[in-house]
């Protein structure tokens, strides 16, 4: 009995694993094909569509069928044409709806970015919207494939040629040239492609710099004093420690005014170049030009463990330095914008999901860049084209049937191609730091050396003290703040 129970449990587990392995996959209507080879028979590298798959894309299949057509599915099922309201039931037919055994999902390829040279905002926009090969033609063909009429000028028979580009407020309008007259229904009503709502987002990973000019360290101050041992025994178990805060002053210039429009999506840290230590941060969602200089403070320390003979003193020297660095820099900013198509849809076929045939005037806006919403996202609509009712805008399956999958993939890849603009300028920084604490040869104390000086630092009452003049105001003017000297017992004697 126990073995039977275990066997039954194994079958249940095996069945569950098989069910997981055979999870439903999307059926892309543009890859369906009708074979007239008999019930349940498909051509090479195709298989019959089953009942569940046909149900998931029922409206698409029925839309490709004749009024009273009946076509076969897998396992003895059939689907009936629009005259039968697309009913799916057991039955027989002489032809079969089939699907590839190795379907192509047909993702939109991602092309390398189109780089626009640095310039001010109008320069960058102008270069983009006047680029015939990389912008005007791809967007014109998008409008044409979606069913917009007259996407070309009067002096050319081809889509996207003889196009005029005009300034429109803060944006641009691309439209076929209307000079010289034309023939055809409403041929003067050219489709307009409006480009507007430009935005620029800094790409921190794109940082590059030119030749670095870095000065050798420059001595700005030498502090000299004494470590004094008033006791009758040598002192060697103490650390002399210099602590200070130093500021690094930095500035950047921006070559063009586009930097005022560029924002940082996330908190941004300036990359380190050379030996100058910086900790520059620009907050998220700030203009790149909002912070063109400042100062960062770092706390530093230096230590030495001197050996001072009995009733002796040794000279102590601390040298303070500064260093400069400068270089030209470049970042890239990701350019995003709205692409609005305005015109009337062709009566002979258009991709609006209801496929109107009364030549309606139609406006639709796509966002080229970061995702905003479903209605404006080409990639979202394309990826979800296999779900009837989810995409209530454009019928991308229709565009594939009319123009071919590879044609649509190529066109949409060019429309969605990332665009980047150069952000250039010059960066400079100055930092301060202390060199090592230097110790000289011991000198015997004079007979009156027990008289303490006001600026001495005691070594925990053990006879070791420091006599080193520190002018806080002077040191602050040199970029060194909160300067202190201390004598403490060594931790690892």
Curated annotation (Swiss-Prot):
What about PTM?
Answer: Proteolytic cleavage and subsequent release of the propeptide trigger a major conformation change, leading to the formation of a heptameric pre-pore that then inserts into the host membrane.
Q: Which InterPro entries match?
A: Aerolysin-like_C (IPR055267), Aerolysin/haemolysin_CS (IPR005831), Aerolysn (IPR005830), APT_dom (IPR005138), APT_N_sf (IPR037015), CTDL_fold (IPR016187)
The region called Interaction with host N-linked glycan is annotated at 68-84
The Gene Ontology biological process annotation of the record reads: symbiont-mediated cytolysis of host cell
In the record, the effect of residue 330 to A is given as:
No effect on heptamerization
Alphabetical list of Pfam families matching this protein: Aerolysin (PF01117), APT (PF03440)
Propeptide residues? Answer: 446-493
Instruction: Report residue spans for region: Part of the transmembrane beta-barrel after proteolytic activation of the toxin and insertion into the host membrane.
Output: 256-288
Query: Which chain positions carry the site (Important for oligomerization)?
Result: 155
- Sequence segments annotated as region (Interaction with glycans from host GPI-anchor): 346-355
GO CC, sorted alphabetically, is:
extracellular region; host cell plasma membrane; membrane
Show the CDD domains listed in the entry.
PFM_aerolysin
Comment on protein domains = The C-terminal propeptide is required for normal protein folding and secretion; it maintains the aerolysin precursor in its soluble form and prevents premature heptamerization and pore formation.
What's the stated role of this polypeptide? Secreted, cytolytic toxin that forms pores in host membranes after proteolytic removal of a C-terminal propeptide, leading to destruction of the membrane permeability barrier and host cell death. The pores are formed by transmembrane beta-strands and are approximately 3 nm in diameter.
The UniProt family comment states: Belongs to the aerolysin family.
Quaternary structure, from the entry? Homodimer in solution; homoheptamer in the host membrane. After binding to GPI-anchored proteins in target membranes and proteolytic removal of the C-terminal propeptide, the protein assembles into a heptameric pre-pore complex. A further conformation change leads to insertion into the host membrane.
The protein, known as: Aerolysin
